[in-house]
């Protein structure tokens, strides 16, 4: 089965996610998180991509990205995951023992309106949702912590947002998403479908060839001929 197409056009917004192979831990200690953030900084120097929000968890990571050239997101994350894999194996002496990541990263386009804020909140409250902290801003390995630290700790990773940040942003992040918002984000993660209003989603799906992501996966159900008139 062919891999689904990936949208990666300059100046568009995207959510990206990857996990450890079989959901295994890829950040075992604080030094691992620090090392990955240094890799991110190196990648930003090499490839035209901006980090708007992110969160690193023990076995996966989330990013909200804005490439500044076509293909910038894919090139950036491909280099980051490859470099992280190489350095992880070198550090832990695990070369030849299997993959670090489950595969290539997953992504979906985000509409640059209130839908962007929903995804940013989803990302920045990931550790809070997992009950690892009492407040979202307490999680050291993410953009909210960095945004609240002035100046931003080295290495510098964050770019200015293309939309003005909503007032009382920290409190907004600490408030749970509505069930509708949460399920909509999770569906876009699962399918790789654009996240926005219906008209925008249909337009972007046609533009990037993502129509298949809007359809339920799996084989269509076969109706029982005995019940065809019921």
In which residue ranges do the predicted regions lie?
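Short Pro-Cys-Gly-centered "Cys-loop" motif that presents a nucleophilic cysteine in a tight turn
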Residues: 1-57, 66-230
């Amino acid at each position: 089965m062919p891999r689904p197409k990936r949208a990666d056009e300059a100046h568009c917004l995207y959510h990206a996610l990857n996990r450890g192979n079989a959901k295994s831990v890829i950040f075992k200690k604080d030094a691992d998180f620090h090392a990955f953030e240094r890799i991110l900084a190196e990648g930003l120097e090499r490839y035209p991509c901006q980090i708007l929000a992110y969160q690193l968890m023990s076995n996966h990571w989330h990013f909200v990205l804005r490439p500044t050239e076509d293909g910038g997101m894919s090139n950036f994350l491909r280099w980051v995951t490859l470099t992280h894999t190489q350095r992880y194996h070198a550090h832990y002496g695990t070369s030849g023992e299997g993959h670090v990541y489950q595969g290539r990263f997953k992504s979906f386009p985000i509409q640059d309106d209130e839908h962007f804020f929903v995804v940013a909140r989803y990302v920045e409250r990931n550790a809070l949702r997992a009950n690892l902290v009492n407040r979202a801003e307490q999680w050291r390995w993410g953009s909210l912590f960095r945004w609240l630290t002035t100046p931003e700790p080295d290495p510098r990773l964050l770019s200015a947002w293309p939309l003005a940040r909503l007032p009382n942003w920290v409190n907004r992040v600490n408030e749970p998403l509505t069930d509708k918002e949460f399920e909509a984000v999770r569906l876009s993660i699962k399918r790789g479908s654009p996240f926005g209003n219906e008209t925008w989603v249909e337009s972007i799906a046609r533009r990037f060839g993502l129509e298949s992501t809007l359809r339920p996966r799996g084989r269509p159900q076969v109706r029982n001929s005995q019940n065809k008139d019921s």
